[in-house]
């Protein structure tokens, strides 16, 4: 048996931001805190201007020629960046797979409840796994379950598209629906 891999127990090396004395470029294009261009300035002169205003010199674009620096309050800038990142994480929605279970002999009201649940899941951007459960000898009627799932897909046609057609999996029959990206346009007959 091969030896177990060893894990590096050292703390990860964090990249320090290029501010003030950490900036190593001799010539910099400097923008002040109001967004006004100060032009291409020597690094020491730019640091002097920043210290006179009691602000920091922050490297904004390293790839430009010459590199672009901005005179600003770095603590405030860092706080704003963290706030933006937090908002972006909050807004990003992880798609989940929600499940709607039923039997092939389902009553009208129960079926309508399952359709309502599936609609709610699809509108919130989640995928839906529709499952028909068989017990005992009911598995002989898998054609009725497939018909039920296809009817469900047809009823949810405006909100969803079939990702996986009905198929048997053990003692169940399943079908996957995913939210429709573009609204379905129905054609008029006549």
UniProtKB/Swiss-Prot annotation:
<dbReference type="InterPro" id="IPR019814">
    <property type="entry name" value="Translation_initiation_fac_3_N"/>
</dbReference>
<dbReference type="GO" id="GO:0003743">
    <property type="term" value="F:translation initiation factor activity"/>
</dbReference>
<comment type="similarity">
    <text>Belongs to the IF-3 family.</text>
</comment>
<keyword id="KW-0963">Cytoplasm</keyword>
<comment type="function">
    <text>IF-3 binds to the 30S ribosomal subunit and shifts the equilibrium between 70S ribosomes and their 50S and 30S subunits in favor of the free subunits, thus enhancing the availability of 30S subunits on which protein synthesis initiation begins.</text>
</comment>
<dbReference type="Pfam" id="PF05198">
    <property type="entry name" value="IF3_N"/>
</dbReference>
<dbReference type="Pfam" id="PF00707">
    <property type="entry name" value="IF3_C"/>
</dbReference>
<keyword id="KW-0396">Initiation factor</keyword>
<dbReference type="InterPro" id="IPR001288">
    <property type="entry name" value="Translation_initiation_fac_3"/>
</dbReference>
<dbReference type="InterPro" id="IPR019813">
    <property type="entry name" value="Translation_initiation_fac3_CS"/>
</dbReference>
<protein>
    <recommendedName>
        <fullName>Translation initiation factor IF-3</fullName>
    </recommendedName>
</protein>
<dbReference type="GO" id="GO:0016020">
    <property type="term" value="C:membrane"/>
</dbReference>
<dbReference type="GO" id="GO:0043022">
    <property type="term" value="F:ribosome binding"/>
</dbReference>
<dbReference type="GO" id="GO:0005829">
    <property type="term" value="C:cytosol"/>
</dbReference>
<comment type="subunit">
    <text>Monomer.</text>
</comment>
<keyword id="KW-0648">Protein biosynthesis</keyword>
<dbReference type="InterPro" id="IPR036787">
    <property type="entry name" value="T_IF-3_N_sf"/>
</dbReference>
<dbReference type="InterPro" id="IPR036788">
    <property type="entry name" value="T_IF-3_C_sf"/>
</dbReference>
<dbReference type="GO" id="GO:0032790">
    <property type="term" value="P:ribosome disassembly"/>
</dbReference>
<dbReference type="InterPro" id="IPR019815">
    <property type="entry name" value="Translation_initiation_fac_3_C"/>
</dbReference>
